[in-house]
């Protein structure tokens, strides 16, 4: 899985090497 950012109205999800990190806004 390539690193990337998925933006949503609730939070930002950071995906890197299969790991998913959620950053609340």
Curated annotation (Swiss-Prot):
Domain of life: Eukaryota
Family: Belongs to the germin family.
The name this protein goes by in its record: Germin-like protein
Organism, as annotated: Populus euphratica
Organism lineage string: Eukaryota, Viridiplantae, Streptophyta, Embryophyta, Tracheophyta
């Amino acid at each position: 899985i390539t690193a990337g950012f998925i933006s949503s109205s609730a939070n930002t999800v950071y995906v890197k090497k299969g790991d998913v990190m959620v950053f609340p806004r």
